[in-house]
């Protein structure tokens, strides 16, 4: 039995556009709820959210029966944490702050078993292989692993073409918040200069043949990103949905 099919990677390879939601609450219960909402993918954030290995595992278990594909953003691009996430059953990894082709190449190696990579071999006791029940997991896992890298500062932009040329990088995700800060517009992701830079970057990624991704909840920017060639777009955030809905209801009934 081979490794499970990565439906997210397959859909990207077939030219589909996929819409997702950013999950920062770090709870399996909310993950399970959003897994029934109809998003193509759900991002479990290990960088800016109070997640650890066990909470990420629990959210992945909660999404097991969902059609929404879990993407795991690791806190840093280190081999040890990527290995843990893959052994837990993650098939799509998002790595923040990728600045060079050399860094991207190391990340590719971290996601692959030897001889092509340096992922540690321990799948016999891992959730990814059904705790050893998927007998052909090792030889087939690499083909079902999807690596997404984040370009989110001036250095990454400067080296974008070289990063895009790295075999094994499946997509490049734009980080608007860090990118705007790096370009001197901290907290101004909707500044016209930042938006123009983002859209040009999305087009460069798309023109290279790689999948371009972004997080934005602004309808106009979502459409502009799609028009520029974005293929996986986070159009919602769990915290924002909860907070904004709560504020709206509270304000409605407290007006008097």
Swiss-Prot record:
Positions that bind a divalent metal cation: 152, 178
Enzyme class: lyase
Keywords: Lyase, Metal-binding, Pyruvate
Hydrolase among keywords: no
Listed cofactors: a divalent metal cation
Entries under SUPFAM superfamilies matching the protein: Phosphoenolpyruvate/pyruvate domain
GO molecular function, one term: aldehyde-lyase activity
Pfam families xrefs: HpcH_HpaI
InterPro entries: Aldolase/citrate-lyase_domain, HpcH-HpaI_aldolase, Pyrv/PenolPyrv_kinase-like_dom, Pyrv_kinase-like_dom_sf
Active site: 48 (proton acceptor)
A GO CC term assigned to this protein in UniProt: cytoplasm
Chemical reaction(s) catalysed: D-glyceraldehyde + pyruvate = 2-dehydro-3-deoxy-L-galactonate
Coiled coil: none
Sites marked Transition state stabilizer: 73
Site, as annotated: Increases basicity of active site His: 87
EC number: 4.1.2.-
Family: Belongs to the HpcH/HpaI aldolase family.
Role noted for this protein: Aldolase which can catalyze in vitro the aldolisation reaction between hydroxypyruvate (HPA) or pyruvate (PA) and D-glyceraldehyde (D-GA). The condensation of pyruvate and D-glyceraldehyde produces 2-dehydro-3-deoxy-L-galactonate as the major product. Has weak activity with hydroxypyruvate and D-glyceraldehyde.
Protein name per the record: Hydroxypyruvate/pyruvate aldolase
Origin species: Roseobacter denitrificans (strain ATCC 33942 / OCh 114) (Erythrobacter sp. (strain OCh 114))
Source lineage: Bacteria, Pseudomonadati, Pseudomonadota, Alphaproteobacteria, Rhodobacterales
